[in-house]
Amino acid sequence: MAPPAAPGRDRVGREDEDGWETRGDRKARKPLVEKKRRARINESLQELRLLLAGAEVQAKLENAEVLELTVRRVQGVLRGRAREREQLQAEASERFAAGYIQCMHEVHTFVSTCQAIDATVAAELLNHLLESMPLREGSSFQDLLGDALAGPPRAPGRSGWPAGGAPGSPIPSPPGPGDDLCSDLEEAPEAELSQAPAEGPDLVPAALGSLTTAQIARSVWRPW
């Protein structure tokens, strides 16, 4: 009678057999997996041929040529999208600049008609608004506002507007002793406050092109 085999040896033998079976299954499945992979590649290439059929793709092209044409087409689409984004950003920047300039004009009109505001304070306020003008250095947006920023800022009397940018609206005479000084915006004549875009077209940069003051008033960006 043969002695019984050790339990450890039986376990090692079964593991070796399982390992050989696993490796054998992998070798048997490898050709099938490779065949499926090639079929997927060929199917995708055929779909690319159909998608590009209306363009320069001919009836018979090598797979490498199909891939090259696909890469060119994708690159063209990406460049087009980038140009569209840049154009939208430029248009938004122009609208923001036009709105900012119009708001500065309205502030200038108010501080010019309000006798209670000191001339120095008004000049500092307007100069601060000019220095805070939204500019993007190195882009066409800076050229867009170049005409509006021409000349160093100064504080000419009551207006406090830089040289070359004064709207030209006359300063009203001081109110009588019984009048309140700038008690409320509603007490100021609406014509004086609403005529700012019409009196100061030179404040709008010439680089805005064909944009008129009325168009700017309708399309400007406002923070409220």
From Swiss-Prot:
Residues 181-190 have a biased composition (Acidic residues). It is found in: Nucleus. GO terms for cellular component: chromatin; nucleus; transcription regulator complex. SUPFAM superfamilies: HLH, helix-loop-helix DNA-binding domain, Orange domain-like. Residues 25-77 form the bHLH domain. Residues 147-161 have a biased composition (Low complexity). GO terms for biological process: cell differentiation; nervous system development; positive regulation of transcription by RNA polymerase II; regulation of neurogenesis. Transcription repression requires formation of a complex with a corepressor protein of the Groucho/TLE family. Interacts with HES1. This is Transcription cofactor HES-6. It comes from Homo sapiens. The lineage of its organism: Eukaryota, Metazoa, Chordata, Craniata, Vertebrata.
